[in-house]
Amino acid sequence: MASKRIPLVAGNWKMNFDHLEATYFVQKLVWLLRDAHFDFKRCEVALFPSFTSLRSVQVLVEADKLHVAYGAQSVSVTTQGAFTGDVSADMIAHLGCSYVIVGHSERRKYHPEDDANIVDQVRAVLAAGMQPILCVGESFEERRQGIELDFAVGQVRDVTRDLNEEQAAKLIVAYEPVWAIGTGMVATPQSAQDAANAIRNDLKTTFGTKVSDSVRILYGGSVTSKNAAELISQPDVDGFLIGGAALDVEELAKIARLALKSTKSRN
């Protein structure tokens, strides 16, 4: 990871933890990291609770002045009105969220979100003053065909073609090969680097070096404390979007410490 980009360790809780469990987790995570003298200025930690827990997490973080960011797992493209079950970007922003996950493979699969909808989500998140974490990645079929890099880059390009330079610079990309999510299988560090580098080069071609050098690219897919150090040692991998391991507070703290350690080795 390039030292000028602050690593981001993002824990996606998916549909786990009620609001009481969520606040307990946040408290324990901060305690574990503080005990390890964690430098939150050199490595960012963010959590993604369910909608029902966001307000509880906000109250805790603001009251105790905790150095943990948080965000939402999805967002509606509409602002208000008769859209039962939807939650707008402005509503999420008013809860103090910094980030919103957009285009996660589970959203694409179970709540069919097409490319146009994902573009609209990204624009809604940006308009509300937050940063979108755009999830991209290939299935086994694309990988079998040898088109995984083109596929991931194409997913990013489908979004960035509608953004200007200022908007693109605020984008965070999470490369999550679908075949590695929740399976225990993980991309090799070189595969993760190849994908991240291809995405960054495409951003450079479209927007220039200033934008491409500023965009953080995360890896997701069966990340654990056993493989995190080698993954984040890759020059274009700037952190993680973590699923299963993010439900274990001690494991998540270990991964965060490894991400922080990677910044020290590059200075």
Curated annotation (Swiss-Prot):
Lineage: Bacteria, Bacillati, Actinomycetota, Actinomycetes, Bifidobacteriales
EC number per UniProt: 5.3.1.1
InterPro entries according to UniProt: Aldolase_TIM, TIM_sf, TrioseP_Isoase_bac/euk, Triosephosphate_isomerase, Triosephosphate_isomerase_AS
A Gene Ontology molecular function term of the record: triose-phosphate isomerase activity
Protein name: Triosephosphate isomerase
Source organism: Bifidobacterium longum (strain NCC 2705)
Complex and partners: Homodimer.
A GO cellular component annotation in the UniProt record: cytosol
Pathway: Carbohydrate biosynthesis; gluconeogenesis; Carbohydrate degradation; glycolysis; D-glyceraldehyde 3-phosphate from glycerone phosphate: step 1/1
Gene name in the database record: tpiA
Catalytic residue list: 104 (electrophile), 176 (proton acceptor)
Gene3D superfamilies attached to this UniProt entry: Aldolase class I
